[in-house]
């Protein structure tokens, strides 16, 4: 029966949802083109080693062997292939690229998610300025505004915040690892046991509140100002504060939150990272951030980079269907092909009626509740 079923985690796409998805891809692609980004496209198959830095819990790539016995995978990520491309060509950064394509990740059984995901995004490579983050967030905000996505929440985090606090605490490697494991896993009882010996540390009041430091940006910044030394706020939080101010100026309708308790989505993130969702949504619509170690697996020289990726499937599910337009069939004799095609081109939701007789055309229109435009000469109708 396997020839009648799809592999777990895959689906066919057709009908109104497929149309919505294709229109969405076109809208996002045009936005990136108009913003001056250059198109880039990498192969669906890559060598497994390209994705060594990738760490996605509970997920594995689809894997196979090529004719030389080398392990190749269907790409589970679209950022690392761009790092591979830069390291193996004479392209000189900075570059501003946009892409659209599918990634494949074998998820846990019964997870309720799909293994094939369509993404569209941008990569700004070679830019150290905070303006690169702002450029990504600005493009995302404009696209969401164009799509009419309201009640959007954008959550900002910093991949270096936890490491900086741990350095300030001067923990040894084993203690730091145990601390991070408990903290990110939200194992609060273990976390409380780990911070108990630090009761005399000036950061102890902060450590007690840290697991709950997520939510409205103004509230979180006020708490941090009360709990942390000013140098920590200046060093690590200033970029977050500036980014929040930028977003509120550009997109006042956007709800911006801060989460200083979340683990970076990948180990190669080195600064601000973000994701967005709508009220009641269970998937991120877009995500991204800074990763200044982009080429670490490919060459000695590192490059600063910021990226943004839309989950096309998640966004598609948030968009309404286009208003129903009555289907219209256009029927004509073979000699009227050009006239019939011209009629289809100027009639909303019309298509050629590919049958041989008017009676068949009428039956097809009735079956699909469609209008029928008959171009055949009256004398040809018996």
From Swiss-Prot:
A Gene Ontology cellular-component term: cytoplasm
Gene3D superfamilies documented for this protein: Bira Bifunctional Protein, Domain 2
GO process annotations (BP): histidyl-tRNA aminoacylation; L-histidine biosynthetic process
Compartmental location: Cytoplasm
Primary location class: cytoplasm
Entry keywords, A to Z: Amino-acid biosynthesis, Cytoplasm, Histidine biosynthesis
GO molecular function: catalytic activity, acting on a protein; histidine-tRNA ligase activity; transferase activity
Family that this chain belongs to: Belongs to the class-II aminoacyl-tRNA synthetase family. HisZ subfamily.
Name used for this protein in its record: ATP phosphoribosyltransferase regulatory subunit
Protein source organism: Lacticaseibacillus paracasei (strain ATCC 334 / BCRC 17002 / CCUG 31169 / CIP 107868 / KCTC 3260 / NRRL B-441)
Lineage: Bacteria, Bacillati, Bacillota, Bacilli, Lactobacillales
Gene designation: hisZ
């Amino acid at each position: 029966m396997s020839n009648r079923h799809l592999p777990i985690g895959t689906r066919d796409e057709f009908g109104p949802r497929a149309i919505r998805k294709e229109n969405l891809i076109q809208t996002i692609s045009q936005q990136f083109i108009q913003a001056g980004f250059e198109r880039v496209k990498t192969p669906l198959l890559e060598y497994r080693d390209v994705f060594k830095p990738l760490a996605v819990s509970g997920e594995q790539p689809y894997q196979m062997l090529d004719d030389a016995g080398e392990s190749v995978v269907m790409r589970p990520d679209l950022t690392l292939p761009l790092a591979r491309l830069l390291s193996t060509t004479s392209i000189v950064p900075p570059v501003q690229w946009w892409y659209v394509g599918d990634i494949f990740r074998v998820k846990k059984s019964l997870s309720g998610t799909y293994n094939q995901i369509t993404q569209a995004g941008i990569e700004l490579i070679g830019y150290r300025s905070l303006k690169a983050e702002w450029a990504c967030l600005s493009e995302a905000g404009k696209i969401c505004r164009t799509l009419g996505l309201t009640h959007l929440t954008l959550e900002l985090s910093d991949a270096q915040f936890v490491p900086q606090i741990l350095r300030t605490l001067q923990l040894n490697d084993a203690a730091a690892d145990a601390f991070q494991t408990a903290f990110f896993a939200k194992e609060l009882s273990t976390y409380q046991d780990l911070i108990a010996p630090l009761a005399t540390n000036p950061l102890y009041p902060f450590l007690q509140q840290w697991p709950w430091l997520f939510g409205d940006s103004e509230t979180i910044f006020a708490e941090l100002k009360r709990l942390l030394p000013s140098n920590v706020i200046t060093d690590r939080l200033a970029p977050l504060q500036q980014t929040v101010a930028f977003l509120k100026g550009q997109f006042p309708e956007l709800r911006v939150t801060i989460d200083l308790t979340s683990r970076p989505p990948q180990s190669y993130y080195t600064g601000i990272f973000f994701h967005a969702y709508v009220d009641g949504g269970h998937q991120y619509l877009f995500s991204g951030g800074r990763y200044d170690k982009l080429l670490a697996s490919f060459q000695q020289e590192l490059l600063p980079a910021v990226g943004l990726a839309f989950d096309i499937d998640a966004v598609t599910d948030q968009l309404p269907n286009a208003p129903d337009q009555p289907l219209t069939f256009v029927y004509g004799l073979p000699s009227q092909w050009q006239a019939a095609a011209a009629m289809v081109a100027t009639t909303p939701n019309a298509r050629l009626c590919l049958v041989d007789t008017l009676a068949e055309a009428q039956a097809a229109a009735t079956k699909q509740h469609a209008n029928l435009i008959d171009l055949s000469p009256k004398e040809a109708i018996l």
